[in-house]
Amino acid sequence: MNDFWQHCSALLERELTPQQYVTWIKPLAPVAFDAAANTLSIAAPNRFKLDWVKSQFSGRISDLARDFWNAPIEVQFVLDPKAGQRSPAGATPLAPRAPLPSANPAPVAPGPACAPAVDAHAPAPAGMNAATAAAVAAAQAAQAAQANAAALNADEAADLDLPSLTAHEAAAGRRTWRPGAANANSEAADSMYERSKLNPVLTFDNFVTGKANQLARAAAIQVADNPGISYNPLFLYGGVGLGKTHLIHAIGNQLLLDKPGARIRYIHAEQYVSDVVKAYQRKAFDDFKRYYHSLDLLLIDDIQFFSGKSRTQEEFFYAFEALVANKAQVIITSDTYPKEISGIDDRLISRFDSGLTVAIEPPELEMRVAILMRKAQSEGVSLSEDVAFFVAKHLRSNVRELEGALRKILAYSKFHGREITIELTKEALKDLLTVQNRQISVENIQKTVADFYNIKVADMYSKKRPANIARPRQIAMYLAKELTQKSLPEIGELFGGRDHTTVLHAVRKIADERGKDAQLNHELHVLEQTLKG
């Protein structure tokens, strides 16, 4: 059992980033192996780690166990029995308590429970005059009130999905950076992730970069290095599965490494709406505002869900103003350009436009290949470039689709006991490839582009050359090459029998201009999203 765990840990250390390995794998320990039942029990130091490792790494550990023992092994994750003897992470205050008088009163244990009442009329201890006794009693009463406030704040936070604040933090609002404090022990690190809602797996190290996202990544790194100074707010937009969420988690994780005392919160817009509703129902807007206005970094995902929700927009506007005024960083994502989000107040749109807005485009061929190769490597599988290119050529929309296709290929290969080849890949992705080919056709592209630029579909085949017709025709040719499997001669034939060199010229022209013309790039992005449904 121990030999296996050494082998498993060594492999995972090579596959994961140092941060991931130290945070999630190193604290684990094998505690039991039942050879008769083929079960392996692995202990985690706390519930948070247990749940995360179970959801993120159980599959890989099970695969390694099967390979090691040459038999299917059921891996069970259990809580370390010693975990209950330690104080919960949340009981450790993250900011210093208010100082007490120099007299030495009996200590009051910190914790979420309400502190015991203090009897102000109790006799003074021997050797202590009345004035000193009164000071001690006052200090104890203040500390009891402080503990009660923390408990009440924690209850309200649980209702509103607001990570609890210590009483000192609740009173002081913002706090200063305290580098190194969060790394004091494993529980403190877990507590940071619980409060921030960050996914520690999503980092800059494992973010695959290409032309489609290099500007967004550069801006994200700049913001992580200079929060509240460079590009505030940072607004990232693009279709689903293109890496927006990965990138904003990477910013949060980097800032947490650099400044462990930072108050960071990632939240999906729908959860923010839910918090506003609960605060309204419970008349708890003071707690709501105190929490959101005191952050150092707010990461809000899919803000288009604010559409039509006026009260949510109003509260977010006040939070935005408070954060920016305090030089806190705000990062927002959406599926579309800010001005095109319907149902959002104009004053919010103007705030979004006041920082830096960056699009993340669908990954180009080389980037899709790199994503597949890296993902396969992380799964411990050797994927040939031929197979990666085949998949990347046929699946073009987003990263999630690529990763889903790869999982399907790996499962198909394992189930049938066959090597991963192009033939096996075609079999594994048969349904997916059929759907892709059925969804986007050259005819559909011609109609969509014609409607977008308000010309006739017949103009796509005609010999007319006015700019208002020739330009959309070139765009349609470019999209036909990008989104279908048609060859240049086949595309030319479908555009009124044009020569393949004409199509090649159009494709190169639009591809070149796309990188220089923001308006054209935006139009192409809209057309691609429309065609992909």
Curated annotation (Swiss-Prot):
Region (Domain III, AAA+ region): 197-413
Protein task: Plays an essential role in the initiation and regulation of chromosomal replication. ATP-DnaA binds to the origin of replication (oriC) to initiate formation of the DNA replication initiation complex once per cell cycle. Binds the DnaA box (a 9 base pair repeat at the origin) and separates the double-stranded (ds)DNA. Forms a right-handed helical filament on oriC DNA; dsDNA binds to the exterior of the filament while single-stranded (ss)DNA is stabiized in the filament's interior.
Gene3D superfamilies per the UniProt record, alphabetical: 1.10.1750.10, 1.10.8.60, 3.30.300.180, P-loop containing nucleotide triphosphate hydrolases
Assembly and binders: Oligomerizes as a right-handed, spiral filament on DNA at oriC.
Comp. bias intervals (Pro residues): 96-110
Name the record gives this protein: Chromosomal replication initiator protein DnaA
Major place of residence: cytoplasm
Gene that produces this protein: dnaA
One Pfam family named in its UniProt record: DnaA_N
Record comment regarding domains: Domain I is involved in oligomerization and binding regulators, domain II is flexibile and of varying length in different bacteria, domain III forms the AAA+ region, while domain IV binds dsDNA.
Entry's family note: Belongs to the DnaA family.
Region (Domain I, interacts with DnaA modulators): 1-72
InterPro entries: AAA+_ATPase, Chromosome_initiator_DnaA, Chromosome_initiator_DnaA-like, Chromosome_initiator_DnaA_CS, DnaA_C, DnaA_dom, DnaA_N_dom, DnaA_N_sf
Subcellular location: Cytoplasm
Single GO molecular function: DNA replication origin binding
Residues reported to bind ATP: G241, G243, K244, T245
Region feature Disordered, mapped onto this chain: 83-113
Residue ranges, annotated region (Domain IV, binds dsDNA): 414-533
Protein's GO biological process: DNA replication initiation; regulation of DNA replication
Record region (Domain II): 72-196
Keyword line: ATP-binding, Cytoplasm, DNA replication, DNA-binding, Lipid-binding, Nucleotide-binding
Cellular component GO terms held in the UniProt record: cytoplasm; plasma membrane
